Amino acid sequence: DGLQFPDLYFFQPKKIFLLKGNTVEIQYLNMCDDEVESDFEEITQSQKLNVKSQKLPINIQQRISKENYLKKTEKMLAHIHRGDIYEANFCMEFFAEDANIEPVEIYEKLNEISASPFAVYFKKNQHYLLSASPERYLKKEDEKVISQPIKGTAKRNLNIELDEQSKMDLQNNPKERSENIMIVDLVRNDLSHTATKGSVEVEELCEIYTFKQVHQMISTIVSNVEHTTSPIEILRTTFPMGSMTGAPKISAMQIIEELEETKRGLYSGAVGYFTPTGNFDFNVVIRSILYNSENKYLS
């Protein structure tokens, strides 16, 4: 693990700047609420940070050769044919050593290319996450819990007719639909652990959402929970998200642990927040760059 990210990290922010459309909502803890005006003045008078990194070449390497990857894929298929699992999300790492990047600049470029609803720029000491994730893992709004797994991707096309055809092909692709529905069943089971009786429901099945670069097949599964149900318990009984493991979840995870070359770390994990009222919203960490600025390791 060249990144050396912590497995788990939470913090309580003293100061929050919450962007809502064209407005900014500022929330400070009582211990520092007397700093609001001075902070606001400093921000409004500051110049835009002009970050320009040196264009040094980065040598991206693959963690496993194509030949060995295909051999491991055959082993994965053997598990499927034997009935151990129905599907699995088999990942490999692409990485660079001695990489010098400017994280802010890279993040801005990444999200110019692929504007995503669950994008994240996160820094903890020397650790950076630059994410263009389109996927929600789990959200809680009062008594309602929402999961939106993604399975199924199709490239956009500049030609309107071809773009629409790409969308329709994805909608009707039996392989993509089958994979999506398997994960829907898994999520329904996960949510049932904390749901009130009979409340688990599929609101959207294999719907096509259009993003800047791709069309995605997304399903929406919801449940209701008692107001006394712990948010931690809801996360504990659903994590990790099925879209990044496969089904059945535990069997898929055991096989992934055996066949993948490196630990995933924060990749295929989640970033999100809790509110003081017990609500939360977490994404899926995919389509992301992870970077350790101390040892210059990029993944």
Could you describe each region identified by the protein language model?
Residues 1-299:
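Extended alpha-helical targeting/anchoring segments
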